[in-house]
Regions:
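Flexible loop residues that form catalytic
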Residues: 10, 90, 163, 288
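Short, surface-exposed charged micro-motifs
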Residues: 43, 211, 271-273
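Redox-cofactor binding/interface segments in oxidoreductases and associated redox assembly factors
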Residues: 7, 86-87, 199
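Phosphate-binding site of ATP-dependent enzymes
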Residues: 22, 145-146, 153-157, 164-254, ...
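ATP-dependent carboxylate activation and anion-phosphoryl transfer catalytic cores
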Residues: 3, 15-18, 228-232, 243-320
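Short hydrophobic beta-strand segments
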Residues: 4-9, 114, 158
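Conserved N-proximal alpha/beta basic substrate-recognition cap immediately N-terminal to
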Residues: 13-141
């Protein structure tokens, strides 16, 4: 079933193909005979009741530095000319990102958008996770220094990070003496308009944090990410390293609790982060990563599994 696929993502020349999940999805789509278009989110245009994008046909190959070829440029109608849109631009989850979800939501009745744009907009990664607070470490969202001091006094060492941050950027640890808490709150308040996330520091992070990928609500695989020496962050984008990992009983319980809701919302490709085998910290729905490392260690084909799910959904839509 050849499909026409439009990939909304960052510039192709900027990606690191050795670990980029979007690139893996494009390679898999191409191998299945699907036609690929590439465009940037700022190429979206709404006019006369239709959503368009200025896009290029593209082919990809797993050769570093020579990994893509752009073909003809065209203005494509995302509701009529393509079968599926992959919404894969990286955060920040700002008004530009939110606006793109509003525009893509307008073609949902015509074209499958992965992940569902309305669901992405309504599930900020560090806010929606609060619906599953029973699995989370102690967490506070605040801009108040007084509230932050009370939280730190209660929990000792804490971590502070931006509410809509990504890839481990601007994540800080505050020691038991709290000496750097006030300047960090001051800096965050000057930099961000939203509340900030404070969480009790989990010593188990020394053993890494686990990225678990779910495809259409089902576990597809997991890796453990170990932090670089002298860093508190385990993100691969921040210098962490991946290793093979199995799920604990609690992690399976977390996935079982999440799965039906992910499926109901149309969140087909999701990555969750778990520390210490039991503490859920984030639910990543905007542009999840990790499938390349998962497949490397587990001998799986997660990109293929994602395309199986996409193709099944398109068949269902066509049969309806």
């Amino acid at each position: 079933m050849p499909l026409t696929v439009a990939v909304q993502m960052d510039p192709l020349e900027q990606i690191n193909i050795s670990g980029d999940s979007t690139f893996a999805l494009m390679l898999s789509a191409q191998a299945r005979g699907h036609a690929l278009y590439h465009y940037l989110a700022d190429a979206l245009t709404w006019q006369d009741g239709r959503l368009y994008a200025g896009a290029n046909r593209v082919s990809v190959q797993p050769t570093a530095g020579d990994h893509f070829r752009l073909g003809d440029f065209a203005i494509i109608d995302l509701g009529r000319d393509v079968d599926v849109v992959l919404m894969r631009q990286d955060p920040p989850f700002d008004l530009g990102y939110i606006t793109a979800t509003h525009l893509l939501e307008r073609i949902k009745g015509e074209t499958l958008v992965v992940n569902d744009p309305e669901a992405v907009r309504n599930a900020p990664e560090k806010i929606w996770v609060l619906d599953f607070a029973r699995f989370m470490p102690p967490t506070m969202l605040t801009r108040s220094l007084g509230a932050a001091r009370e939280f730190a006094a209660r929990h000792g060492e804490v971590v502070i990070k931006p509410l809509h941050g990504n890839a481990g950027k601007a994540v800080f640890k505050v020691g038991r003496d709290g000496a750097n808490l006030a300047p960090l709150i001051e800096l965050f308040n000057a930099t961000y308009r939203e509340p900030h996330v404070l969480q009790a520091f989990l010593p188990e992070v020394a053993d890494g944090d686990k990225r678990i990928v779910l495809v259409d609500g089902e576990v597809a695989g997991a890796i453990n990410r170990r932090r670089a020496k002298g860093d508190i962050r385990s993100n691969l984008a921040a210098g962490g390293t991946a290793e093979a990992s199995e799920l604990t009983e609690t992690e399976r319980e977390i996935c079982a609790a999440l799965g039906p809701e992910l499926k109901r919302r149309g969140l087909l490709f999701v990555g969750i982060d778990v520390i210490g085998g039991q503490w859920l910290t984030e639910i990543n729905v905007t542009s999840p990563t990790g499938i390349v490392a998962i497949d490397k260690f587990n001998g799986t084909d997660t990109a293929g599994r994602i395309w199986d799910a996409i193709e099944a959904k398109i068949e269902q839509r066509r049969a309806a």
